[in-house]
Swiss-Prot record:
Biased composition (Basic residues): 258-287
One GO cellular component, as annotated: large ribosomal subunit
Gene (UniProt): rplB
Protein family according to the UniProt entry: Belongs to the universal ribosomal protein uL2 family.
Organism field: Prochlorococcus marinus (strain AS9601)
Molecular function (Gene Ontology), one example: rRNA binding
Keyword Ion transport attributed: no
Protein name: Large ribosomal subunit protein uL2
Keywords carried by this UniProt record: Ribonucleoprotein, Ribosomal protein, RNA-binding, rRNA-binding
Function, in words: One of the primary rRNA binding proteins. Required for association of the 30S and 50S subunits to form the 70S ribosome, for tRNA binding and peptide bond formation. It has been suggested to have peptidyltransferase activity; this is somewhat controversial. Makes several contacts with the 16S rRNA in the 70S ribosome.
UniProt superkingdom: Bacteria
Amino acid sequence: MAIRKFKPYTPGTRQRVVTDFSEITSAKPERSLIVSKHRVKGRNNRGVITCRHRGGGHKRQYRLVDFRRDKRNINAKVAAIHYDPHRNARLALLFYEDGEKRYIIAPAGVKVGQNVISGESVPIEDGNAMPLSVMPLGSSVHCVELYAGRGAQMVRSAGASAQVMAKEGDYVALKLPSTEVRLVRKECYATLGEVGNSEIRNTSLGKAGRRRWLGRRPQVRGSVMNPCDHPHGGGEGKAPIGRAGPVTPWGKPALGLKTRKKNKPSNKLVVRRRRRVSKRSRGGRDS
């Protein structure tokens, strides 16, 4: 997979960088694996906005993705690589020997015609799913379960991978993409390799309209609002914030505030916390 740059024929193409979609082998999804999905547009069940800047965008159909990989010891052939409008990663369409079809997150390097399998005694190859207890130390994994049988909950985005660091007792230490080292039960399943489409980080939308197509509405700075709408608002001209640091629209500190509960039960499974991102590298966007 590669990226595609455009010549500056228009202002919208000047900064536009997209993936070339060369790995996509079929434009139409598998009809038996798509369902309609209600677009909530950032609202809750009462219609109140709970997530700002959401709404609009192109119509989508949700692809049913197999995050459990619970068809054990049955060979599956990669029939096609499909585009998924709900995520940056691609989907691999699997045809199992018993006739069933399923989608999985497409690992990097997986080709059409390749065979993948899940189980405890399967080859150590990218795309195969197995318990963490049988994976070699130092191997890269993705689609990791937090609880056995619940399905993959971590390391599912494009280009992401975790590393098997150590095994001790009933737990396996994983280094996550955030640099956090966390203990996971050894019977939890994961898939070898990293998620494909890693070049997505080098793309650029190029214009505001492409962001609207993806269902994202404009984000207005708090400093240009009125005082009744945002703590940063008001003042004459380009007035400063007037506080020690930037805050959210509800008055909470916007940068550096830890939101994880101090007494969360899973804290004992975190061996090393993720690396802190400095304000300089994070940027102080006016929320």
